[in-house]
Amino acid sequence: MKPFRLYAITGEEFHPGRDVVEVMEEAIQGGVDIIQLRDKTSSKKAVLEKARRLKKLAADYGIPFIVNDHIDVALAVDASGVHVGQDDLPLPEVRKLLGPDKIIGVSTHKLEEALEAEKNGADYIGVGPIFPTNSKADVVDPVTTAYIREVKEHVTIPFVAIGGIKRHNVREVIEAGAEAICVITEIVAARDVKAASQALLAAMEEASQ
């Protein structure tokens, strides 16, 4: 898996009336280099149709396409991989289903979970939520940038910081040791999605100096 910097997750509830593929294409044009379909409410058929279209989009731009949770959908569209949470199918079982070459990401909220994911062969981990977020109703309390520092020190696989990350607070995240961030609303809810992506990347670069 090649390194990525800016990871965008779909959030159709934040751009009513706009097509998800159109929004994600603008995000990619702004510098997003990996995308994930996250849909907890639509029918499986609808999720599959979106996944097909997003897979084609990602392929056209030469970037990975990840499916959140729906392993069957990921297999059906030959996605680059899946992202699973702590309450989803255990990582070793996911690997059996997907095979050795697909990307598997795992959400983690504490160091114990991060180390477990690494031991079980995760390709990357999500680290968060760093800040309070309203894009997920079932999230745990914010883990703060202290968790980024812990992961940076103890975990060797790639990680991506997620949760409430905005242009105004991304410096804290980068200075804590994150090299990649994952966002939903800061990109997909923006009036100008491409510009929002570019602004986040610019803020990350500035913080990295």
UniProtKB/Swiss-Prot annotation:
Record: residues binding Mg(2+): 69, 88
CC annotations in GO: cytoplasm
Alphabetical UniProt keywords: Magnesium, Metal-binding, Thiamine biosynthesis, Transferase
Protein name (database record): Thiamine-phosphate synthase
Catalysed reactions, semicolon-separated: 2-[(2R,5Z)-2-carboxy-4-methylthiazol-5(2H)-ylidene]ethyl phosphate + 4-amino-2-methyl-5-(diphosphooxymethyl)pyrimidine + 2 H(+) = thiamine phosphate + CO2 + diphosphate; 2-(2-carboxy-4-methylthiazol-5-yl)ethyl phosphate + 4-amino-2-methyl-5-(diphosphooxymethyl)pyrimidine + 2 H(+) = thiamine phosphate + CO2 + diphosphate; 4-methyl-5-(2-phosphooxyethyl)-thiazole + 4-amino-2-methyl-5-(diphosphooxymethyl)pyrimidine + H(+) = thiamine phosphate + diphosphate
Cofactor(s) this protein cannot do without: Mg(2+)
Gene responsible for this protein: thiE
NCBIfam families hit by this protein: thiE
Xref: SUPFAM superfamilies: Thiamin phosphate synthase
Any one Gene Ontology BP term: thiamine diphosphate biosynthetic process
Residues engaged in binding 4-amino-2-methyl-5-(diphosphooxymethyl)pyrimidine: 36-40, 68, 107, 136
Pathway(s): Cofactor biosynthesis; thiamine diphosphate biosynthesis; thiamine phosphate from 4-amino-2-methyl-5-diphosphomethylpyrimidine and 4-methyl-5-(2-phosphoethyl)-thiazole: step 1/1
Name of the top EC class for this enzyme: transferase
Amino-acid positions noted as binding 2-[(2R,5Z)-2-carboxy-4-methylthiazol-5(2H)-ylidene]ethyl phosphate in the UniProt annotation, renumbered to this chain: 133-135, 164, 184-185
Function per UniProt: Condenses 4-methyl-5-(beta-hydroxyethyl)thiazole monophosphate (THZ-P) and 2-methyl-4-amino-5-hydroxymethyl pyrimidine pyrophosphate (HMP-PP) to form thiamine monophosphate (TMP).
Details of cofactor binding: Binds 1 Mg(2+) ion per subunit.
Family: Belongs to the thiamine-phosphate synthase family.
EC number: 2.5.1.3
Gene Ontology terms for molecular function: magnesium ion binding; thiamine-phosphate diphosphorylase activity
Presence of keyword Ion transport: no
